Amino acid sequence: MNAPSPAPDEVSFGRSADGLLVALVGETAFAMAPARDGRHYLVTAWCISRPMAEWTRGDFYGHLGELADEAAFRSAVLENSEHQRERKMLGRVEEYSRAHTPWGASQGATVYADGVTSHSTARHGGFKLSADRNRKVHFLLRTKGGWYEEDVEWAIIAVTFPHLFTAFERRCAERTIKDSWPDAWEGIFGTILLPGESREKDRRAFEQAHAQDWIVVSAIRSKHKSGFVETVATRGAKRGPGTEVRRFLVLPDEYHVGRFGFVIDEARHQVYGGPSDFVGWR
């Protein structure tokens, strides 16, 4: 007979049958899974029926990003425990719904408050705000119809109605707005985002700084030039008809894509015009 699951805000840590550091928060299971190069990832599962000591890596299917070490794993699990505790206190109500949404028929709704409803569909999902609620959204972020998709735009709801979300959700929402709509964030909050505080703003800076540089748009380990990565690059990573394209050879140890692409150093990286491993260049 299985032991009862801990309450949503209780945490249990242990080791799996294959030696992984694991944890349980309510019915959500977590594991610190090894990857290549000594890295680790936070993986999750739902409602594993066996005791913790019988879990294996194969039980986990969700992926929540990279972990630096065991301390980072424990911190992430405790953060989730706090998130679940706060979410329970918010009193969100699950309802049956077949409402029409931009992503198809609703398969269920979660009511956060009067006029703030989240819909799940077969393909996607998102929030619907009533007209009164939507008028409270800042005009720089407001959508005309009051629909906000679940991947990115949900964050607009969270920063507009922060009392309806957990601290974890609010932190994620702030990060999402800064990354996706830095101009709106700066305009609304009267601040300037510094390098590293907004992915979109950093991307623009990268593109401006490297507009005339050769940036790799495709790469493959070369069979014709052993010990090199064959790359295809264009100025500023531009694509489309009429774009000048060149190939360069790069040592594998040097080739790291980075956040926005690999910039060719013409003083170090050799222009290549020989046989290619790319289809269309042969």
Residue ranges of model-derived segments:
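A short, structured beta-strand/loop element
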Residues: 48-50, 118-142, 238-248
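Surface-exposed beta-loop interaction hotspot
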Residues: 67-108, 189-215
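A solvent-exposed interaction/effector surface
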Residues: 109-110, 117-121, 135-144, 171-198
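Short Lys/Arg-enriched alpha/beta "domain-start" segment
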Residues: 1-21
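Extended, charge-biased low-complexity segments
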Residues: 3-6, 25-29, 35-49, 58
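A short, exposed loop/beta-hairpin motif centered on an aromatic-Gly-Thr core
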Residues: 54-69, 141-149
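Eukaryotic intrinsically disordered, low-complexity regions
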Residues: 206-282
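Short, compact, well-ordered microdomains
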Residues: 61-71, 151-196, 249-282
